[in-house]
């Protein structure tokens, strides 16, 4: 006879406790414990231990590596983030804010897979078949039929998968699924963890790629215990400003590929469109000849990404000047402002400073330091930086400009987009092999950058 009891779970890491705790001893999170009913087996509760059958260990040399190739999703930006395509038997978690486009992205992927004659089942626990059909019609005609299932009972879903043996399964969303063996409601910590565990075992045993949609909390992490992210093979976050048209797909965990790649999409009336050249997309509509506007180049994995850095420096009306940073680290901006005040003598203590990465981008790469400094100098001196100039480099506390990685790829991207001048760290100059078509200027310190912005040349 199964015996019911209650256990407290930490919502952050999944730590179990017989009583409520104010602070989790594992992850140190405060007020994170919730009470969940669980089912204990009678034999385990009574202390009776059954004899388990021993498993035979296998020598690694006798295991043949899988010859199965990755299956392309049909969406090149999606394939880039996954590491080249879908790995059979993988469990992929796709998280993001409500309404950001997770279901739309996976429905478009389903359409592309069906066109490749890939057996796919789309399981929805949030929408009816009629609602999914309306969304599918908006995305465009499906050349091949897509198998749909509106179900939240995980036992029924598992039996359906075993019966039809698809190659790819999409679960939308994991918070709506429930197991009958767990007495708590759908979306609870124990239900989400158990459902993910069942799907993981199913994916490995049947060699089926399973995508699960997970909603995020107000802190921006997937709802449910943090152990959920440790159970899956890949964790993708679909993010972006809901008021902007572009979306970014990032991998924060990937057992089968890099976590440094991003996929860029644009939300349009027909769904999500791939952005093949994100640099050109980010710089569209940039004003020319305006003080405080500078183009920088950041690296997202192996892809150079050009973006506009904006700065507004003006006289303050408060005793303590305001400092705001949108899209980059606030403390880093304060550090750079202090460097300018100390090394160049700029009177920034009496000025408000507002820093913004145009388009709602969020970056913390040190390589955009020099562009932030250039934008601040440009706004402070009211001297516009030429629109065909691109700047990148890391700035140290002594005002020196340090080398950054992949400098040649950044310069090559600037040349491809028609930029004529590129200001880079002096220590990176020796690694730039091709300078045809673009003028590359080495910057040793912030004084060199100040001279370039004010006079157009750098002192020897």
Outline where the language-model segments fall:
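Conserved Walker A/P-loop ATP-binding site and its immediately adjacent core
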Residues: 125-131
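Conserved RecA-like ASCE P-loop NTPase motor core of nucleic-acid helicases/translocases
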Residues: 120-124
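Peripheral, non-AAA+ core regions of ATP-driven protein-machinery
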Residues: 2-12, 16-80, 87-95, 100-107, ...
């Amino acid at each position: 006879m199964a015996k019911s009891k209650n256990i407290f779970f930490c919502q952050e890491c999944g730590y179990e406790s017989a009583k409520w705790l104010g602070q989790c001893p594992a992850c140190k999170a405060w007020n994170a414990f919730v009470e969940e009913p669980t089912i204990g087996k009678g034999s385990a509760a009574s202390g009776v231990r059954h004899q388990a059958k021993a498993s035979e260990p296998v020598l690694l040399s006798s295991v043949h590596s899988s010859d199965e190739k990755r299956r392309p999703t049909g969406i090149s930006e999606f394939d880039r983030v996954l590491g080249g395509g879908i790995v059979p038997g993988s469990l992929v978690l796709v998280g993001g804010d409500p309404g950001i486009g997770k279901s739309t992205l996976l429905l478009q992927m389903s359409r592309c897979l069906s066109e490749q004659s890939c057996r796919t089942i789309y399981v929805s626990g949030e929408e009816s078949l009629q609602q999914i059909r309306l969304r599918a019609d908006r995305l465009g005609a499906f050349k091949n039929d897509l198998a749909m299932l509106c179900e939240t009972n995980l036992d029924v879903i598992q039996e359906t998968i075993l019966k039809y043996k698809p190659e790819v399964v999409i679960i939308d969303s994991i918070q709506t699924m429930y197991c009958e063996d767990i007495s708590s409601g759908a979306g609870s910590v124990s239900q989400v963890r158990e459902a993910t565990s069942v799907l993981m075992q199913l994916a490995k045993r049947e060699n089926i790629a399973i995508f699960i949609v997970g909603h995020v909390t107000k802190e921006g992490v997937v709802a449910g215990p943090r152990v959920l992210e440790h159970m899956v093979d890949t964790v993708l976050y679909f993010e972006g400003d809901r008021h902007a048209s572009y979306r970014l797909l990032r991998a924060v965990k990937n057992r089968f590929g890099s976590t440094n790649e991003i996929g860029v999409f644009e939300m349009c009336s027909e769904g999500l469109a791939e952005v093949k050249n994100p640099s050109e997309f980010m710089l569209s509509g940039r004003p020319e000849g305006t003080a405080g506007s500078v183009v920088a180049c950041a690296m997202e994995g192996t892809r150079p990404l050009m973006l506009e850095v904006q700065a507004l420096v003006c006289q303050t009306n408060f005793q303590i000047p305001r400092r705001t940073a949108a899209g980059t680290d606030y403390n880093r901006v304060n550090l750079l402002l202090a460097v300018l005040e100390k090394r160049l003598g700029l009177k920034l203590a009496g000025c408000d400073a507002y820093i913004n990465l145009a388009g709602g981008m969020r970056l913390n790469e040190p390589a955009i330091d020099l562009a932030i400094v250039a934008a601040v100098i440009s706004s402070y001196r009211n001297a516009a930086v030429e629109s065909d100039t691109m700047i990148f480099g890391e700035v140290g506390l002594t005002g020196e400009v340090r080398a950054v990685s992949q400098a040649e790829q950044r310069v090559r991207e600037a040349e491809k987009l028609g930029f004529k001048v590129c200001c880079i760290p002096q220590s990176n100059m020796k690694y730039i092999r091709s300078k045809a078509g673009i003028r590359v200027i080495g910057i040793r310190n912030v004084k060199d950058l100040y001279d370039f912005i004010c006079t157009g040349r750098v002192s020897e």
